[in-house]
């Protein structure tokens, strides 16, 4: 699905075929040139189509998108990192977050929710949060330096340290005041499922990317 990673020859047709069944025009997508940072971008109606057909006009150095505009599909691309879907049904605002370990360290989920609160008057008790497929604690081996980055979500097994990327973001959502019954997790590990998902850890930098999309109807 990516225009920058993996075999991109069929990326546009893949996007079209995937989104057609959802009633979404792939040419309307708003995408970001993700940088594993924590910048959150508000998307206005005039931004429709940015990054849809070319990587060049996507939002640069951006890893989270929010909007309150209808028929404006937001997209992020992952291959082990965690896609986080946010929906405020009361005020009709949405957000989509690309949360790798670096963005998680910088609390990108919190920054996204705070901007939704500022712009949409979102109340965290109303917020619905969804975690898509990502590398899970079963497979996410990391170095001892991660103890300097996270005080939670690290476990040791057979002499190796493992990171719970989803668990850290879930705790962050709960700490913000999101109701635990409003948190939904796919429980899918990208590393464990080579036939269904790309995995940067498994395949290396040349692997393709999955696309996550959210839109207000």
Where are these regions (language model features)?
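Active-site microenvironment for binding and transforming phosphate-containing groups
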Residues: 1-217
């Amino acid at each position: 699905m990516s225009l920058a990673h993996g075999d991109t020859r069929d990326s546009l047709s893949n996007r079209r075929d995937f989104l057609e069944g959802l009633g979404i025009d792939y040419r309307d997508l708003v995408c970001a040139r993700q940088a594993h940072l924590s910048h959150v971008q508000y998307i206005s109606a005039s931004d429709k189509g940015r990054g849809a057909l070319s990587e060049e006009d996507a939002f640069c150095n951006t890893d989270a998108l929010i909007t309150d505009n209808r028929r404006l599909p937001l997209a992020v691309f992952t291959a082990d990192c965690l896609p986080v879907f946010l929906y405020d049904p009361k005020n009709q605002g949405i957000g989509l977050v690309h949360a790798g370990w670096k963005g998680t360290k910088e609390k990108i989920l919190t920054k996204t929710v705070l901007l939704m609160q500022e712009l949409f008057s979102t109340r965290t008790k109303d917020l619905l949060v969804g975690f898509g497929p990502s590398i899970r604690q079963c497979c996410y081996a990391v170095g001892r330096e991660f103890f300097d980055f996270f005080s939670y979500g690290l476990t040791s097994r057979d002499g190796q340290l493992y990171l719970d990327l989803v668990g850290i973001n879930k705790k962050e959502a709960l700490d913000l005041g999101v109701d635990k019954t409003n948190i939904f997790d796919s429980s899918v590990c990208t590393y464990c499922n080579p036939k269904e998902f790309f995995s940067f850890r498994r395949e290396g930098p040349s692997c393709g990317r999955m696309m996550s999309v959210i839109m207000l109807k």
